[in-house]
């Protein structure tokens, strides 16, 4: 909050007071300049300290204060303190609008858009970035226009990428809304590229080429993606930008993987590995090793795959990346099985189990347990195949975990496994003791793998009484115990809506606000009746005092609107004097807001509804040594076609020989896109 405004310097008698104010102004400016110098040197923490000190001293120069707000917001952004960055960029926007600084308003809107994008508030970010674009075009600022186009493209790209991660789909296999979002990103990047070519800005052209390549990669246009990434690579080499060059090689490798050119992809990943060592970035070095390990798995060179996965494991341990360490152990287990070394594979499977338990990865834990049981059976350490067919699932049903991929213990691979959530919620009785493998055509749709989802007319089979058929080779079905919700004689829908209405009716009373009538018995008169009392009451009729009721609502809402208004006098570091009070009062626009303002307001308010939605279940954290583009689902499909070639011929019983290999499709890796 701003401190009480002292009198202006010219209002105080004597030159001493004027010298004091001059020193205060000089002190504020000097502190801000030192903060700017430190931020340019990369010391953002120290820079923030000087900027905050400048705000504490305060200034009556509105332009200086606006610049301090902008610099503070940027410094907090680089420190990843996005809430504080958002706060100061809002201060900057408010002050710029108040003094009528259109260019300052454009820059503040752009900074707000970038911060909102990082916070995942994409719709609000688009509104702010569009405001930046509109003002830049209005002022004829070509550089600002290009920057605004690039920022809008970034917001659409980030939104599309997040949606594709949530959908857990491969590049090119995306829902229509995600594709539309990415097409919008591509349009703005194309406009940005055209403008920066006109301006002759080669560095900006490189950024546009790189982002166009990334967008086309997500859309599944892999040939176009390689074209753009080659342009990005050429410009990075032109500027000697090793970090950008490394990213271009990595992106080229990802695109060539999906084009089926695994050997070309391996060469690009090797270049990535060399550059990551040159710039001394261990995290990206580990990512390159991981990508090379997966590439050599696709090339069926399992010894080299294991070599690179071991390098990944060592770096992940050095960086304390437990997610990456677990993924490396899982990959090493599969590689050693493919090389015919189940004993070494068992060691890594046990390590994978331990790490999955530590980080709370339920899917990984189930996968590791099944791998261990399978490998122990193959090594002859289990006396009964039933022990491998029934791994320890205790605690999974109670905690509601739904493993996505599991392993089959027959001659083929396990298919996608999901628990029927609707039955779990409706409380039907299931027993975990009898495992049954119905054919794929008889499974309900949520329990089929993506590979078999094209069958539209599947019907669920119920377990037969007294049946003890062996494990079918098609699928495995995990069944859950009865939940605590009793079944009503009515249908599922009636039961659900009955429970919902009872629950919601009790919540309504909690949201009522008492009316201040000033009478002693008002509290008793407005007390909410209990559930039983409401059930006995007749239906409520309309009140005759309708006008008074709406007047009450209007007065209440008007007070709430006043509470939400931004006050210029509350800006930190602002000293209001006679010199600047005219700017604060006179530069506002007296005319009524136009359609553009109301359209922007509607978009903003509609995005606020999403903030009140329940968040989806948390996904696994992404370790620093794990690349964003994992392409592991491609390995799953390729490996599924080569299962016969990868089987290990172990001496032992027929059961051991038929047990097969741990399926590399058991678990979707964190970060798969």
Curated annotation (Swiss-Prot):
Binding partners and assembly: Interacts with INSC/inscuteable and FRMPD1. Interacts with GNAI1, GNAI2 and GNAI3 preferentially in their GDP-bound state. May also interact with GNAO1. Interacts with STK11/LKB1 and MACF1.
Omega-N-methylarginine modification, residue list: 418
InterPro entries reported in the protein's UniProt record: GoLoco_motif (IPR003109), GPSM (IPR052386), TPR-like_helical_dom_sf (IPR011990), TPR_rpt (IPR019734)
Annotated function: Guanine nucleotide dissociation inhibitor (GDI) which functions as a receptor-independent activator of heterotrimeric G-protein signaling. Keeps G(i/o) alpha subunit in its GDP-bound form thus uncoupling heterotrimeric G-proteins signaling from G protein-coupled receptors. Controls spindle orientation and asymmetric cell fate of cerebral cortical progenitors. May also be involved in macroautophagy in intestinal cells. May play a role in drug addiction.
UniProt-recorded name of the protein: G-protein-signaling modulator 1
Post-translational modification: Phosphorylation regulates interaction with G(i/o) alpha.
Residue stretches of biased makeup (Low complexity): 516-530
Swiss-Prot/TrEMBL domain comment: The GoLoco domains mediate interaction with G(i/o) alpha. The GoLoco domains are essential for the GDI activity toward G(i/o) alpha.
Transmembrane segments: none
Annotated PANTHER family: G-PROTEIN-SIGNALING MODULATOR 1, LD33695P
GO cellular component, one term: plasma membrane
Residue ranges, annotated region (Disordered): 420-477, 510-544, 609-628, 645-673
Compositional bias of kind Basic and acidic residues: 420-439, 451-467
Protein family according to the UniProt entry: Belongs to the GPSM family.
The TPR repeat ranges on this chain: 28-61, 66-99, 106-139, 146-178, 180-199, 206-239, 246-279, 286-319, 326-359
Domain GoLoco: 493-515, 546-568, 594-616, 628-650
The keyword Lipid biosynthesis belongs to this UniProt entry's keyword annotation: no
Subcellular location: Endoplasmic reticulum membrane; Golgi apparatus membrane; Cell membrane; Cytoplasm, Cytosol
Induction or repression: Up-regulated in prefrontal cortex and core region of nucleus accumbens during late withdrawal from chronic cocaine administration.
One BP term from GO: positive regulation of macroautophagy
One of the record's GO molecular function terms: G-protein alpha-subunit binding
Modified residue annotations for Phosphoserine: 410, 442, 467, 469, 490-491, 543, 567, 653
Interaction with STK11/LKB1, as annotated region: 361-485
Tissue note: Isoform 4 is specifically expressed in brain by neurons and also detected in testis, liver, kidney, heart and pancreas (at protein level). Highly expressed in cerebellum and subventricular zone-olfactory bulb system. Isoform 2 and isoform 3 are specifically expressed in heart and are also detected in brain.
Keywords: Cell membrane, Cytoplasm, Developmental protein, Differentiation, Endoplasmic reticulum, Golgi apparatus, Membrane, Methylation, Neurogenesis, Phosphoprotein, Repeat, TPR repeat
